[in-house]
Amino acid sequence: MLLSRMKPAVGGEASTSSNEKKRKNKSKKIPRLEDYLNQRDYLGALTLLEFQRNSGVSVEHADLWTGFCAFHVGDHKRAMEEYKALTLRPDCPVDVWVYLGCALFFLGLYKEAEEAALKGSKTQLQNRLLFHLAHKFNDEKKLMGFHQNLEDVTEDQLSLASIHYMRSHYQEAIDIYKRILLQNREFLALNVYVALCYYKLDYYDVSQEVLAVYLQSIPDSTIALNLKACNHFRLYNGKAAETELKNLIDISSSSFQFAKELIQHNLVVFRGGEGALQVLPPLIDVISEARLNLVIYYLRQDDIQEAYKLIKDLEPTTPQEYILKGVVNAALGQEIGSRDHLKIAQQFFQLVGGSASECDTIPGRQCMASCFFLLKQFEDVLIYLNSVKSYFYNDDTFSFNYAQAKAALGNYREAEELFLLIQNEKIKSDYVFQSWLARCYIMNQKPRQAWELYLRMETSSDPFSLLQLIANDCYKMGQFYYAAKAFDALERLDPNPEYWEGKRGACVGIFQLILAGRESREILKEVLPMLRSTGNPQVEYIIRIMKKWAKDNRVAL
């Protein structure tokens, strides 16, 4: 069956009158620059301006608008070139110098930006630019001067909020953004800024809620989707974060190219450092966090020297930078036995943990715990760790530090439980872990487990140190059988007279426990070979006494 057509497939235009065609053509408006600007379609406006320039169409202030649009699409180099060309003209408006300063600022040319801005007229834009430059130059006096010139208008208040954010005063920034939002509900992008502040305050769930408001209206925002991925990383894991980031890559919006480096950087973080050496080094001067994450990568690889080289010349300005410098100095101090580096680390931790903005945050309290840990003030360590332990359920690194503090204060039972919760193989193979666990076993009357821990250790210098610990701790605790075994093993490795004295005392101690009925008589069979392995004249005298007692008490040797 053939279906008849209501309209012809081709040639339908023939029925349209020429008058109707003219009417339709007239209804198609030629795009105007004002329309693009009103819609904030700066890329469209820039395209139109370029077309008009190439076509020889004269537009009033075309060069100014070209610089303006280039700036707003993120092409700051193009904006700089346009504004520089304008400054060479004798009739150049004085405000152009400030616009040039803004472009130079975003290119990281701060000195040149200041020089250009000072040639411009004294406007609120100039004040805001100089305000931000004072922050970049760490010039507190100038910063406060420009701060006083700010007015209670949206642009100035947003500028102030930005400075608060960069100085880690996140709550102050939130207060400003919320106040502006109450007056201007249509300023949806401010929700992203608020969400960023909550992210920095570690309130990842709150950040996610605020961000959702913006994403409902602008679902393909690069910055918002990237922040959502970062929240997922903090709330869940790297896999969940990577899924969110892949959604961003799939969208490939017009701003995707601009955020390419950011996405590459974050993928490395979400994947636990995979590809760090290929991706992060070129981004060190592009993304501030790239240097910090590369330092973290080196720390995880136990390459403390490389981590130190990368961060030693960094002048910290944020809590994260102070913390990381503290961690690197602490690790280096422990590795090379440098008290100076440990002292620097302690000072960095104290600076962050004692600051008004960080003292009640989780990282701030961890810093104070680290500070007191280095000072060996373990009661204070526990005060701070107890206050944040609910946030670190099943966190092996936290459990490791918490257990050490407990053990240092003699809470061996709790410390043992914490040590045994740890699943991370790297931590479990660390001598510090093994020595503390062995001590806990011994103090909790479990010397056999401590001995088995030694037997499982691979051949290195560490087993010798662990043997010394087991020998001495078992001796102190009256666990003479395992003390004797440890001193015997030490003596075979190093014929030091002190080890013989320890073994002799432990063997006599075992004999005393047997006499008191607190140790099995059968152990005497193991004691005699240990004594005979030493060529000391005292050996025969001790063995003779033990043999006589065994004979009198019908103990087979």
UniProtKB/Swiss-Prot annotation:
Q: Which PROSITE patterns match?
A: TPR_REGION (PS50293)
The residue spans of each TPR repeat are: 60-93, 95-128, 154-187, 471-504
Q: Does the keyword Repressor apply?
A: no
**What changes when the gene is disrupted?**
Defective cilia. Morpholino knockdown of the protein results in cilia defects in the pronephric kidney at 27 hpf and distension/dilation of pronephros at 5 dpf. In the eyes, the outer segments of photoreceptor cells appear shortened or absent, whereas cellular lamination seems normal in retinas at 5 dpf. Left-right asymmetry defects with abnormal heart looping, hydrocephalus, pronephric cysts, abnormal ear otolith formation and curly body axis.
The lineage is: Eukaryota, Metazoa, Chordata, Craniata, Vertebrata
List keywords of the entry alphabetically.
Answer: Cell projection, Cilium, Protein transport, Repeat, TPR repeat, Transport
What name does UniProt use for this protein? Intraflagellar transport protein 56
Q: Which organism is it from?
A: Danio rerio (Zebrafish)
SUPFAM superfamilies, sorted: TPR-like (SSF48452)
Keyword check for Aminoacyl-tRNA synthetase, yes or no: no
Q: Where does this chain mainly localize?
A: other
Cell location: Cell projection, Cilium
**Subunit structure of this chain's protein:** Component of the IFT complex B.
Question: Corresponding gene?
Answer: ift56
What GO biological process term is on the record, naming one?
A: cilium assembly
Function per UniProt: Component of the intraflagellar transport (IFT) complex B required for transport of proteins in the motile cilium. Required for transport of specific ciliary cargo proteins related to motility, while it is neither required for IFT complex B assembly or motion nor for cilium assembly. Plays a key role in maintaining the integrity of the IFT complex B and the proper ciliary localization of the IFT complex B components. Essential for maintaining proper microtubule organization within the ciliary axoneme.
The record's family statement is: Belongs to the IFT56 family.
List the molecular function annotations (GO) for this entry.
intraciliary transport particle B binding
InterPro entries attached to this UniProt entry: TPR-like_helical_dom_sf, TPR_rpt, TTC26
* Compositionally biased tracts (Basic residues): 21-30
